[in-house]
C-alpha cells in the first residue's frame, strides 16, 4: 500500500516533534508580534525579539489552490496541495540521502498568500522557458538548486532555478517525506 502525502507529512512532523525534544533549538524561533502564527507556543508570554518555542499546527481548513489553478489554467498536482495546506509551520531543516535541505511551509495566512504568488511566478517562468511545470517544495544547500514536484508525474526532482530538472530524487512526494529526517542547521 502506498503512503499518502498527508500520512507521510504527519509522520515527518511526528519525527520533527521527537527531534525537538532532543534538540530544543530546532523548535525555537524569534518571536515577532507583527508576524502572528498559531505555531507559537501558547504557554509562554512572548516579547518581540525573544526566542520562544514553536511547533507545526494542523490547519483547520485545507486549500485546493483553486484560485491559483484557475489563474494559471492548470490543475495543481494534488500531492502539492496536500503538502502545502496540511500544516502551519516554519520551514524545517532535514536530511535526505541526496543531501541537506529545508522543507518549505507556510507560517500564517499572509505567508501562504506569498507562497502562492511565488508558485505562480515559478510556473510562469517555466512556461516562458518552455520547460515542464514544477512546483518547488524545498531548498537545498547548493545555490540556486531547489527540490520540486513535477506537476505531471508527481516525482520529486532536483532542479537548478531556470533550468530543466536535473535528476529524480524520489518517485513521489509521499516517498520523499518518508525518506527525510529532521536535522539541525549546522
From Swiss-Prot:
It comes from the Bacteria. It is found in: Cell inner membrane. Keywords: Cell inner membrane, Cell membrane, Membrane. GO terms for cellular component: cytoplasmic side of plasma membrane. It is a peripheral membrane protein. Interacts with the SecY protein in vivo. May bind preferentially to an uncomplexed state of SecY, thus functioning either as a chelating agent for excess SecY in the cell or as a regulatory factor that negatively controls the translocase function. HAMAP family: Syd (MF_01104). Belongs to the Syd family. This is Protein Syd.
